[in-house]
Amino acid sequence: MAADTTSGVEHTDDGRHIVVDGRMWRATDPLIPEGRRAELVSILMAWRREVRRTHGARASRDGVQAAKVALGERGTPWWEQSEDERRARWETPVESPES
């Protein structure tokens, strides 16, 4: 396994997963432009706060799901998609809570 020198996060050799406390999680799609990635991460974190605030309301959990799909962390694995499919996924609008 290789460490990402920019974030300190350990990745599997194929780059498809990160390793946190010995557990593998799907990595964010590396083709997402940095600005859009930052926007999606911000939306994801807002939805996570909303999950806590609403004690896990379905709409809040659905918001987390939508953001994670857009980031490539859930849904069809990004390495199985064409570049056009990947671009369409991250360009799909993802609402913020209370927007």
Which residues does each PLM region occupy?
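Extended, charge-rich alpha-helical interface modules
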Residues: A2-S99
